[in-house]
Amino acid sequence: MPLDRGGPTMARLKLATYNVNGIKSRLDKLLEWLGRESPDIVCLQELKAEDTGFPRKALRDAGYGAVFVGQKSWNGVAILAKDADPIEVRRGLPGDDKDTQGRYIEAAVDGLLVACLYLPNGNPQPGPKFDYKLAWFERLIRHAATLQKSGHAVVLAGDYNVIPTDLDIYNTRSWLKDALLQPASRECYRRLLAQGWTDSIRALHPDERIYTFWDYFRQHWEHNSGLRIDHLLLNETLAPRLVSAGVDTWVRGRPGASDHAPTWIVLDDAPRKAVRKRAPARKVAKRAPARRAKA
């Protein structure tokens, strides 16, 4: 049963993370989603565009300011804010001055410190790509410990490229050799949570199979053969404000869509005492049958 927060209705903030898988080629899908769902803050991954190719004007026309780190053909992350300009705090994950990949950015938005990340995939493993993934994860763990103790309300949002538990995958059999499912990857995620970070989806939907990614191959979307690899982690200062969480799966059903769907949370503007309450159906994101989603 989902958790909701009691008390009077207050101003709320909707924050989402979305691996857009090419911002130029899928700009129309992004703008459609922004117009329909109207999130206040958005973390984007896999822009696959240099800074000069970032669609700043189109997003500004849609009502969103942005900070971003681009990279030609690969990676790239951005933070969007509705009717505001995010204030960039950090560009790049600390710990390796030689790492120039566009995978991490931090910004101050609406009283929050928002960190947007695109963790390395790590395939094939074993090998140098998997070694880089684990080294990057270690750097994230060290930096996250600093953020946890900063006193600020912090969210670590993005594509983590890790499947935390077997509940987060349709079937482990086909993924046993994949970097996303390796014990070392899962252990890094567990260590991150052990610092006191709250996995938003699991905090509110502890027993439900919720996916954020469906591979393009073998009709994974049509068969709902998904993974949950896009996560929004809240530090101890911010977690008490969590109200609801879900996935906008309708976006994945659009022709030519990214293989990810936007994952979102709603925050109160002040902490609320948690009470158990049956949530309205709209608060639990369910994937519509593929034949309807593609209509």
Feature roles, as predicted:
Residues 134-146:
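Internal catalytic-core helix/loop-beta-alpha segment
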Residues 15-19, 34-52, 114, 143-166, ...:
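Active-site beta-strand/loop signature of hydrolases that rely on acidic residues for catalysis
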Residues 12-21, 111-126, 157:
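Active-site-proximal beta-strand elements of phosphoester/diester hydrolases
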Residues 36, 51-53, 85, 89-96, ...:
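Metal-dependent phosphoester-hydrolase catalytic domains
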Residues 94-95, 120-137, 173-178:
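Surface-exposed cleft-lining segments at the edges of enzyme active sites
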Residues 2-61, 74-77, 272-295:
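N-terminal, active-site-proximal structural segment of metallo-dependent hydrolase catalytic domains
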Residues 21, 48, 94, 120, ...:
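Catalytic metal-binding/acid-base residues of hydrolase active sites
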Residues 47-50, 54-124:
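Structured beta-strand-rich core segments of catalytic domains in phosphoester-bond hydrolases
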